[in-house]
């Protein structure tokens, strides 16, 4: 722990030890406890701690202005979708996430130094507590002032940080004698360091972290070159203590809550709310047992039963949770999260479906789209980016609401089947793992599962922290660690960046690795970024090697060959690139950028590249999107991409410092994925697209030639795949399509323009003929049935029909079922070795099992059969033994007594 007592002492604070929790803390006045709950009760409810009341946005402005006046550059908030610039977490959980890992590792300069930001942040690790405790939120605004100190540039450290905090709190009218600084340790997002938790009247308002370490995978830590001031001021809590309302929701979401109360008719009991918040503040609410204990304590204080408390509090808690959740969704969806069954999309869908369930509990008739509209209208005055995505947000919510309704309807059958299996295994209660799996895999809410289970007398216990458990399983990316292969050779000089048109080069062999050559320089593009490697050949001293693949291991390019290597290290070689392949891959790569840009224009700026694979003949591009792309949209994307080609825009390709590139272009740079390094290669198509990209590209968009979109498919929930071709491959596809059109026209002896109408007419006529054939078959079958009825025979006490018919399996089943209404048993076979049996209800009650009869008969055909006692079928390859099979059936029936 670094020592930070000097500044605190100068400000008049003294060190104490909390008699309740044992933590070390600092205070201006002598006190026994540290000032944080549960050691101290909330002392601000009904008794505001500041000199005036602030709403959330007033305190946010006050915070930003305070630090701007003290030399901090205000920066715009980052998207809550952290995957825009990092690949280890899905959502922003604190303002420091904005600068991890690139700035905090020292690789990249910060956007300003020092800086201040009001960052919307999302944490779902307490989602079940939202609405219940008065203080828990899924989405909150973290005010952060940050300073990044290096060896040659010390901005400020602990003394200034502590004074800034003290001054800001007193600036808004908080009595300094009520402020405590608790010594602690912080860890998050891959970094850690000592910290102070700053509390007033029982609530933690800010955390002052002094980041000095990187957290290692094994739990250890190592020092980092930067020393970072990372502060987090909970701005919702500042608004809360300034207003003294019963809950933080009332202080920050008042207009939305008022509208929800009006719509639901829920009665707000401020006595219960205040008492609940007071008691919750004294508890660490982590588990189901904690929540039960909270309710018991509140009920005891109010002199009512737990059941009475739950009846009174549950509707209010639902209103608060809906207000919080819709705010969280507004930021998620505006910033590009697409609800799905995976990754950040799963978390968005979890919040959507939990909100829908809460609305159902309240008996709300309004749609979630209606409620989201209320929330968006409230937020858009403060966040222009939410205003610009208003329609997009509502479209997604509307679609998700309909999907949820279908899921619940479909879920009944799945739940009933699961309960049946559990009962068969002797279980009387659904295990938690299965409850979570039904939600995780099928989207069935636990409350719905409980309702269905209750109907069949099966027990389901839903933990109060169910959604928290589910969220925790899905909050971070889980990837298999890659094997770290290191080659002890100098970095390969990559010639294709400076000389993109060259196809021949000279280099020296500096090593051999497995079946590959390592050169000091190369024109071979190694596979990466979804672009396959170049191929070609290498020659030296009469030796010629075909290069099938080039790959980059670290900074070293290995040129793979299937030939026996006949070149020694130290040899000078000549390399030759397959020109047609390079040209097609280059065209397809630039075409990918154009299609992404066109898709964003047509579908919306939520579109984000989820993957890509370039090819010679065709390429594919995966895009995040909440619904299927329509034919009209696809045609417009194709038209726009080709318009970019015809504009013949010259590309600008250059290396830039990462921080400068991000400042100029934003995170749109990382459409193709997050790239490492302090310097990145920026490929800009002015007025069209810009991306950080290491692939090969044409000089001008006109060099691509034709772009042809071939097809689309939904490869997973929330991801659309576009398959396309460019250049000569696109022309080839067009010509093949034209050939198919001409051949089809020739078959019908019409012109291509007449083909759709002709096909429609032929299809209509074919359907009519099919219906006529079906009608005639039914008539023939009826005649055949009459004929067979006349040939019914008696076997012991049974009336049976055994015959061969020229009909398929379905037709034989229909015949057998119809005949079994007039006789005891029917066995029919066709010349293809198919056999069917049916038995009347009376015959089955008397003991006839037609499935056993058919099984014996099918065995004669060399096959097998089965079914139910009243209807069965079978088949076998021995078509010459159909008559024998029927005789076997006759023999089997002769053993049955009616």
Swiss-Prot record:
GO cellular component assignments: cytoplasm
Manner of cofactor binding, per the entry note: Binds 1 zinc ion per subunit.
Record SUPFAM superfamilies: Class II aaRS and biotin synthetases, Putative anticodon-binding domain of alanyl-tRNA synthetase (AlaRS), ThrRS/AlaRS common domain, Translation proteins
Main enzyme class: ligase
Keyword Aminoacyl-tRNA synthetase annotated: yes
Keywords: Aminoacyl-tRNA synthetase, ATP-binding, Cytoplasm, Ligase, Metal-binding, Nucleotide-binding, Protein biosynthesis, RNA-binding, tRNA-binding, Zinc
GO biological process, alphabetically ordered: alanyl-tRNA aminoacylation
Name of this protein: Alanine--tRNA ligase
Organism name: Methanothermobacter thermautotrophicus (strain ATCC 29096 / DSM 1053 / JCM 10044 / NBRC 100330 / Delta H) (Methanobacterium thermoautotrophicum)
Chain's gene name: alaS
């Amino acid at each position: 722990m670094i020592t930070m007592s000097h500044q605190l002492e100068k400000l008049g604070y003294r060190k104490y030890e909390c008699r309740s929790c044992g933590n070390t803390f600092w205070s201006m006045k002598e006190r026994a406890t540290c000032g944080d709950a549960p050691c101290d009760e909330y002392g601000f409810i009904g008794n505001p701690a500041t000199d005036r009341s602030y709403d959330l946005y007033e305190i946010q402005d006050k915070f930003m202005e305070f630090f701007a006046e003290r030399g901090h550059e205000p920066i715009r908030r980052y998207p809550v979708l952290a995957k825009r610039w990092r690949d280890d977490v899905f959502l922003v959980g604190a303002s420091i996430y904005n600068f991890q890992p690139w700035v905090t590792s020292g690789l990249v300069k910060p956007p300003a130094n020092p800086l201040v930001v009001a960052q919307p942040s999302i944490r779902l690790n307490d989602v079940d507590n939202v609405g219940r405790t008065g203080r828990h939120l899924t989405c909150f605004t973290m005010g952060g002032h940050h300073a990044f100190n290096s060896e040659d540039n010390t901005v400020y450290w602990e003394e200034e940080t502590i004074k800034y905090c003290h001054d800001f709190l007193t600036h808004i009218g908080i009595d300094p004698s009520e402020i405590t600084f608790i010594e602690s340790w912080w860890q998050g997002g891959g970094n850690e360091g000592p910290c102070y938790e700053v509390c007033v009247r029982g609530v933690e308002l800010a955390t002052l972290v002094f980041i000095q370490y990187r957290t290692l995978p094994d739990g250890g830590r190592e020092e980092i070159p930067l020393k970072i001031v990372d502060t987090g001021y909970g701005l919702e809590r500042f608004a809360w203590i300034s207003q003294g309302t019963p809950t933080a929701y009332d202080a920050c979401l008042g207009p939305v809550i008022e509208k929800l109360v009006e719509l639901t008719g829920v009665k707000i009991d401020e006595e219960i709310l205040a008492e609940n918040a007071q008691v919750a503040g004294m508890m660490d609410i982590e588990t189901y047992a904690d929540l039960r204990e909270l309710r018991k304590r509140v009920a005891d204080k109010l002199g009512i039963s737990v059941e009475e408390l739950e009846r009174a509090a549950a509707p209010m808690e639902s209103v608060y949770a809906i207000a919080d959740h819709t705010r969280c969704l507004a930021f998620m969806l505006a910033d590009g999260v697409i609800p799905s069954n995976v990754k950040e999309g799963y978390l968005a869908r979890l919040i959507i479906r939990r909100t829908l369930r809460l609305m159902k509990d309240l008996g709300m008739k309004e749609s979630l789209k209606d409620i989201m509209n209320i929330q968006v209208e409230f937020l858009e005055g403060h966040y222009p980016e939410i205003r610009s995505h208003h329609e997009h947000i509502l479209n997604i919510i509307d679609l998700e609401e309909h999907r949820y309704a279908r899921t619940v309807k479909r879920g009944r059958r799945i739940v009933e089947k699961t309960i049946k299996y559990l009962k068969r295994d002797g279980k009387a209660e659904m295990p938690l793992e299965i409850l979570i799996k039904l939600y995780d895999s099928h989207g069935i809410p636990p409350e719905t599962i409980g309702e269905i289970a209750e109907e069949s007398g099966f027990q389901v216990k839903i933990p109060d922290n169910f959604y928290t458990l589910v969220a925790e399983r899905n909050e971070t990316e889980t990837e298999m660690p890659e094997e770290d292969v290191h080659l002890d050779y100098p970095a390969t000089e990559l010639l294709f960046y400076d000389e993109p048109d060259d196809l021949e080069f000279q280099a020296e062999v500096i090593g051999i690795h497995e079946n590959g050559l390592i050169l000091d320089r190369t024109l071979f593009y190694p596979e990466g970024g979804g672009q396959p490697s170049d191929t070609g050949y290498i020659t030296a001293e009469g030796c010629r090697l075909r290069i099938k693949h080039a790959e980059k291991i670290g900074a070293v390019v290995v040129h793979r060959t299937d030939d026996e290597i006949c070149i020694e290290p130290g040899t000078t070689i000549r390399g030759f690139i397959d020109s047609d392949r390079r040209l097609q891959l280059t065209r397809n790569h630039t075409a990918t950028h154009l299609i992404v840009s066109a898709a964003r224009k047509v579908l919306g700026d939520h579109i984000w590249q989820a993957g890509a694979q370039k090819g010679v003949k065709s390429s594919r591009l995966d895009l995040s999107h909440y619904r299927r792309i329509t034919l009209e949209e696809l045609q417009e994307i194709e038209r726009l991409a080709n318009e970019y080609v015809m504009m013949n825009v010259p590309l600008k390709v250059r290396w830039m410092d990462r921080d400068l590139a991000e400042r100029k272009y934003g995170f749109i740079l990382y459409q193709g994925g997050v790239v490492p390094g302090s310097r990145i290669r920026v490929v800009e198509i002015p007025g069209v697209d810009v991306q950080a990209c290491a692939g090969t590209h044409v000089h001008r968009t006109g060099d691509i030639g034709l772009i042809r979109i071939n097809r689309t498919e939904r490869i997973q929930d929330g991801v659309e795949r576009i398959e396309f071709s460019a250049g000569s491959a696109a022309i080839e596809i067009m010509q093949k399509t034209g050939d198919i059109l001409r051949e089809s026209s020739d078959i019908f002896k019409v012109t291509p323009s007449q083909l759709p109408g002709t096909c429609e007419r032929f299809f209509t006529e074919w359907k009519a003929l099919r219906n006529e054939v079906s009608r005639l078959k039914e008539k023939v079958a009826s005649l055949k049935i009459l004929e067979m009825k006349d040939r019914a025979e008696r076997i012991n006490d049974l009336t049976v029909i055994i015959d061969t018919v020229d009909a398929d399996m379905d037709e034989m089943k229909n015949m057998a079922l119809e005949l079994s209404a007039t006789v005891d048993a029917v066995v029919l076979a066709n010349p293809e070795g198919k056999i069917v049996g049916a038995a009347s209800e009376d015959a089955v009650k008397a003991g006839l099992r037609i499935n056993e009869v058919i099984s014996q008969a099918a065995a004669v055909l060399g096959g097998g059969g089965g079914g139910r006692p009243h209807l069965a079928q079978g088949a076998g390859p021995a078509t010459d033994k159909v008559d024998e099979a029927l005789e076997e059936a006759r023999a089997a029936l002769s053993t049955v007594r009616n």
